[in-house]
Amino acid sequence: MKVALIVCLVWVMAMMELVSCECWSQADCSDGHCCAGSSFSKNCRPYGGDGEQCEPRNKYEVYSTGCPCEENLMCSVINRCQSA
């Protein structure tokens, strides 16, 4: 009985952690992060660094596979951040 209670408690804590990373819009994310993912599972992710996967910035701030690049970097035609 005690083991089941502990397992349930750990599971609830893990679910709370997952929910805290979810986002619905850019406003839900802290500086240096964007809201990206599928319609059903968006998470705050860090902006892309040099050589990392990216999506070009858009006026709707809707991203599916990754975030735009950090400042002073641009998203290339192969969706990788590089020097501007």
UniProtKB/Swiss-Prot annotation:
Alphabetically ordered keywords of this record: Disulfide bond, Secreted, Signal, Toxin
Broad class of where this protein is predominantly found: secreted
Matches recorded under Pfam families: Prokineticin
Disulfide bridge partners, by residue number: 23-35, 29-44, 34-67, 54-75, 69-81
Cellular localization per UniProt: Secreted
Gene Ontology CC entries for this record: extracellular region
Membrane spanning residue stretches: none
Keyword Protein transport: no
Listed GO MF terms: toxin activity
Signal peptide: 1-21
The keyword Lipid biosynthesis appears for this protein: no
Tissues of expression: Expressed by the venom gland.
Source species, domain of life: Eukaryota
Similarity section: Belongs to the AVIT (prokineticin) family.
Name the record gives this protein: U8-theraphotoxin-Hhn1c 3
